[in-house]
Amino acid sequence: MPRKAKLTSDESDRKDQRERTEKLHMTLESADKLSETAPQHLTGEAKKMWETIVPFLNESGYVINADSSAVETLAMNYQMLREAYESVKTVGIFYKAGEKYFKNPAVGIIDSATKVIKSVGSDLGLSPQSRATLIDMANSDDEDETDWEGRFGG
């Protein structure tokens, strides 16, 4: 599997990497930014997460208003993760009912929410590797302009 493209504007990095990064920024520059005010239905930790992460995402230039449902999903799952963790801290991983021990359902919520956060966070470009993937998507438009016949002797 080939290495994912790198997002960078550092002059010490390769020229093609810098050009791809610039192209992606230019493509998204005119798009509407995310509202820094959380949707009204988000409360508590979800609202805090939205208001913390959206300024960073807007500044990054890789996320636009069309991505608001992904940011909302991230914020809601973060709140679920925090609430489930509080349950585990209070009740424990297992609880006793009668003579039997049962796994705290919050453990499953932590597992599920963590996976969603990792996946959606990656989709939003919150890891270096996922940011590099965004460049590849921006370059896919170039294929339409490529002279494939000329490239392959046709």
State the predicted function of each range.
Residues M1-K48, A132-G154:
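Arg/Lys-rich, low-complexity, intrinsically disordered N-terminal tails that contact nucleic acids
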Residues P2-A5, D10, R14, L74-A84, ...:
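Amphipathic alpha-helical protein-protein interaction segments
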Residues V88, S119-G121, G150-G153:
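Short, structured secondary-structure boundary patches
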